[in-house]
Curated annotation (Swiss-Prot):
GO cellular component: plasma membrane
Pathway note: Cofactor biosynthesis; ubiquinone biosynthesis [regulation]
Bilayer-crossing regions: 21-41, 502-522, 523-543
HAMAP family: UbiB
Protein name (database record): Probable protein kinase UbiB
Keyword Transferase carried by entry: yes
EC number: 2.7.-.-
Binding site for ATP: 127-135, 149
Predominant subcellular localization, coarse grouping: membrane
Active site: 284
SUPFAM superfamilies, per database record: Protein kinase-like (PK-like)
Function: Is probably a protein kinase regulator of UbiI activity which is involved in aerobic coenzyme Q (ubiquinone) biosynthesis.
Length: 546
């Protein structure tokens, strides 16, 4: 019942803000187009406010999942009209706050102390309010300035309802759309469910923040604020307050004489460092979570907050991704095609030459061009068409990475439109690959694994024995399977034979009856002998042992 109520709530918001205006009717099949034209929202008058504001307000009312979708879109001025993208930027830190007295109560219940004892000063009005939590400024007893992040009450229930509806839609897509299974929508939604539910646990966010801070300790690329663990709970997070210019405020960055080219290049370097050096990356890098330290404009440094969503890669995915990107940067499209096939991302029967030609057609137009001259919308459309043509399957484990890459590319486009993304990224990847296969890299890998190998050495005989034992069981299992298959095959052949006999017997008996029927009724002894012979043959076919 709650799902139905939530569905009605979503439809009501769509109706009230007339979001049907944003539906691409010309791209929908005729039945869906008719459904849209007859839907109840057309009975509502269009509000007398700009369409961008209508979209933003609707996303805010619908909740965090929809807000996060809007945050991703806000960086895509190449995909959205400028008025929509500019309005959606307000989603990043202008979501309406919840009551301050409720925030105080959550803090005191979680940390088991009154706010007056925890802080020398606590600002009851929030300094920022987002879809999942809001942030209050405070000062510790020792004089350090901090921010206090508090989870919105009741937000988990709303998120779980939205996820349930998304799963329902995903199952419908997977079962009834021809491309559904290739896109793995159910698996993608389930992965997203784990991600966003984890974001509701502020202790997990604190752990992610601490890990990122260690990874970039002493770095001039990015600064991560300090977490105060003694004042952290699953619903409350206290961390160092930072000061910087929001990354989206390009005008202010230029006024501060920030080296915009260096800033954009460092954004790319930070992304690839997280993915390939650390295999641990901040996966919610929309403009509301990124600031710039402009104290040294010639050497600007990023500041990242809100580390609730992070991504990781397996060594296998990391290796395949790096090799694919390097081949792509070198325009070695055949290698890209071969890697996609060998990794199972496209079916093994795919013709390499055809796939190589398709990749070249999509990718060649975007090389040696700055971001401002690349239509990312057209690039994505061509990429999706190629994926569909060659049955390329979506890799759910890489969806978070792709979302992050979209954010980074969008930020780079805003900061320094002349940035050549490919030439900036290629040297970093080449250096990373060289380090992996060079003697120091191999020695480091051996050192990392050596303790595990040594620890398992005494167990090696038992491991070998169990492996051979499993092989013996596997042989018996295979033999049993072969026997079962042989039995099924015999049963199938027997069934086919019976069907043939029934059809033949019916035909023979019908022929016998036709020959026996004449103008005069016959006694049994007067039946023609051919008819009798056919009848006997038909009865034999019906009654013979099977």
């Amino acid at each position: 019942m709650r799902r139905i109520n939530r569905l009605f709530q979503i439809v009501w918001v769509i109706c009230r803000y007339r979001l049907d205006e944003f539906a691409p009717l010309t791209l929908l099949p005729l039945p869906l187009r008719l459904l849209f034209l007859l839907a109840p929202w057309r009975l509502f008058p269009k509000p007398q406010i700009p369409r961008g504001e209508r979209l933003r307000r609707a996303l805010e009312e619908l909740g965090p999942i929809f807000v996060k979708f809007g945050q991703i879109l806000s960086t895509r001025k190449d995909l959205l009209p400028e008025d929509l993208a500019d309005e959606l930027k307000r989603l990043q830190d202008k979501v309406p706050p919840f009551a301050s007295d409720m925030a105080v109560r959550i803090i005191e219940e979680s940390l088991k102390s009154p706010v007056s004892e925890l802080f020398a000063d606590f600002q009851t009005y929030p300094m920022a309010s987002a879809s999942i939590a809001q942030v209050h400024a405070a000062t510790l007893k020792n004089g350090k300035e901090v921010v206090v992040k508090v989870i919105r009450p009741g937000i988990e229930k709303t998120i779980r309802l939205d996820i349930a509806l998304m799963l329902l839609v995903a199952r419908l897509v997977e079962n009834y759309w021809e491309d559904g299974k290739r896109l793995h929508p159910v698996e993608v939604v389930k992965d997203y469910e784990h991600t966003i539910i984890d974001e509701l646990d502020l202790q997990r966010e604190a752990a992610n923040t601490s890990q990122l801070k260690r990874n970039f300790a002493g770095s001039e690329l990015i600064y991560i604020p300090e977490v105060y663990w003694e004042m952290t709970h699953s619903r409350v997070l206290v961390m160092e307050r930072i000061y910087g210019v929001p990354i989206a405020d390009v005008e202010q960055l230029r006024k501060a004489n920030v080296n915009m080219k260096l800033l954009a290049e460092r954004g790319v370097e930070i992304f690839f460092t997280q993915v390939f050096r650390d295999s641990f990356f901040h996966a919610d890098m929309h403009p509301g979570n990124i600031f710039v330290d402009v104290s040294n404009p010639a050497n600007p440094r990023y500041i990242a907050i809100d580390c609730g969503i992070v991504g990781t890669l397996t060594p296998e995915d990391q290796s395949y991704l790096a090799r694919n990107l390097l081949a792509f940067f070198r325009r070695d499209y055949r290698q890209v095609a071969v890697l996609h096939i060998s990794s199972g991302w496209v079916p093994g029967h795919t013709r390499v030459n055809e796939f190589e030609a398709a990749i070249r057609t999509v990718c060649e137009p975007i090389f040696e061009r700055p971001l401002k001259d690349i239509s990312f919308g057209q690039f994505l459309m061509r990429l999706f068409q190629t994926a569909r043509r060659f049955d390329m399957e979506v890799q759910p484990q890489l969806v978070l990475l792709q979302k992050t890459l979209l954010n980074i590319e969008g930020l780079g486009r805003q900061l320094y439109p002349d940035l050549d993304l490919w030439s900036t990224a290629q040297p970093f990847l080449e250096n990373w690959m060289k380090q992996r296969i060079a003697p120091p890299g191999l020695l480091k890998a051996i050192k990392q694994h050596a303790p595990d190998w040594i620890e398992q050495t005494p167990e090696l005989p038992q491991i070998l024995y169990e492996a051979f034992d499993q092989l013996r069981h596997l042989d018996r299992y295979n033999q049993a399977n072969q026997d079962s298959l042989a039995s099924l095959s015999r049963a199938f052949e027997k069934d086919k034979q019976q069907r043939r006999d029934f059809w033949l017997a019916g035909l023979v008996l019908a022929s016998a009856a036709a020959m026996a029927i004449g103008d005069q009724p016959l006694r049994l002894t007067e039946l023609p002998w051919p008819s009798v012979m056919l009848a006997v043959a038909g009865l034999y076919l019906l009654m013979r042992p099977k």
